[in-house]
């Protein structure tokens, strides 16, 4: 994991859940270093950990590397988050006993398109597609590609039209780069040509928002993921209308539940969860939630840590998580 606020929340919740189960948990942040990720996992396996929850492994090496770890340490249980398994030919693979966890990325994308359609009900139903400037980078990050699937469903049926797809040119400075690209692009369109802007990632969205403010534009925008900076921008009551996200505290508990059930050999209880995808096998997806500008503005001093104070009930819903008798007794729910 990278040591961002949402993963700090994840880590805290994971540790609290582990303690409730009578286990101890340690967190190691690799801060987006592929080498550190592999070295840390190798070291943890050598140190005798019973289970590992690993996040954001690279698609070009995760399957081969983790396959080697499970072969060398057959008693070690592993669950992954946002980590796709593909071989050198690009074909999807599985690792026996390893459950893969993801956000419901296509759902995050679709929920945001629905938000945009709700802003233009007459156009969406009668006048033709809603014209969208899409901030997206395909074939770059697996999660972005999964989000594209949910977005394209609406394009296929003619509800939206993508005017153009843009992305930052400098990934080391994504916010400022995205601002420059967005300003340059938006200037090329006449007023009213762009109905809305859909962003695949909130860091890119921050640049877009700053571009819109610099241009004095009232084009509405939405984005995937959320952080305190996004919330502050939404609280201004201007262009940023909604974020699609998941509850990162619940995500930490969820990951610990899955790994604990793996360690107990209770795969049937994992498969019984409503978020388990039987057709994909050993695959679970966290339901998406939309946080709107109206919700943010209805509260005071809202941050990602107290977001539940203004979000709807789906944000704190836990009915989709795997469970069993001893788990319910330990957690009280």
Predicted regions and their residues:
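Hinge/cleft segment of the Venus flytrap/periplasmic-binding protein
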Residues: 128-136, 254-333
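Exported/periplasmic ABC-transporter solute-binding proteins
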Residues: 196, 210-287, 291-297
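Extracytoplasmic "Venus flytrap"
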Residues: 1-17, 21, 26-41, 49, ...
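Short, solvent-exposed amphipathic alpha-helices that sit
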Residues: 5-23, 108-112, 142-162, 177, ...
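Short beta-strand elements in bilobed, periplasmic/extracellular small-molecule ligand-binding domains
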Residues: 19-31, 131-134, 154-175
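Hydrophobic alpha-helical
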Residues: 38, 50-73, 78, 150, ...
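Flexible loop/hinge segments that line or gate small-molecule binding clefts
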Residues: 64-107, 127-131, 228-240
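Hydrophobic alpha-helical segments within soluble ligand-binding/sensing domains
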Residues: 37, 99-130, 144, 178-182, ...
């Amino acid at each position: 994991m990278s040591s961002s606020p949402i993963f700090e929340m994840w880590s805290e919740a994971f540790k609290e859940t582990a303690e409730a189960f009578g286990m101890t948990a340690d967190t190691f942040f690799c801060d987006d270093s592929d080498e550190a990720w592999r070295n840390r996992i190798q070291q943890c396996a050598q140190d005798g950990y019973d289970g590992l929850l690993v996040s954001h492994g690279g698609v070009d090496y995760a399957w081969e590397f983790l396959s080697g770890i499970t072969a060398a340490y057959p008693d070690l249980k592993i669950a992954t988050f946002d980590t796709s398994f593909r071989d050198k030919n690009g074909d999807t693979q599985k690792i026996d006993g390893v459950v893969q966890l993801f956000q419901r990325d296509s759902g995050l994308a679709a929920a945001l398109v629905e938000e945009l359609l709700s802003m233009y009900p007459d156009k969406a139903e009668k006048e033709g597609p809603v014209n969208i400037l899409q901030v997206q980078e395909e074939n770059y990050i697996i999660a972005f590609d999964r989000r594209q699937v949910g977005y394209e469903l609406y394009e296929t049926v003619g509800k939206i039209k993508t005017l153009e797809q843009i992305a930052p040119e400098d990934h080391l400075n994504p916010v400022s780069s995205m601002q420059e690209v967005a300003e340059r692009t938006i200037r090329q369109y006449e007023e009213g040509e762009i109905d809305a802007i859909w962003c695949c990632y909130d860091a890119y969205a921050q640049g877009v928002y700053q571009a819109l403010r610099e241009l004095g534009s009232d084009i509405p925008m939405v984005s995937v993921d959320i952080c305190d900076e996004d919330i502050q921008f939404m609280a201004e009551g201007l262009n940023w209308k909604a974020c699609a996200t998941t509850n990162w505290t619940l995500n930490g508990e969820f990951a610990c539940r899955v790994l604990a059930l793996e360690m107990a050999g209770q795969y049937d209880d994992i498969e019984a969860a409503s978020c388990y995808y039987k057709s994909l096998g050993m695959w679970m997806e966290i339901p998406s939630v939309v946080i709107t500008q109206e919700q943010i503005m209805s509260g005071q001093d809202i941050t990602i840590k107290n977001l539940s104070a203004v979000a709807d009930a789906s944000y704190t819903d836990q009915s989709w998580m795997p469970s069993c008798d001893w788990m319910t007794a330990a957690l009280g729910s």
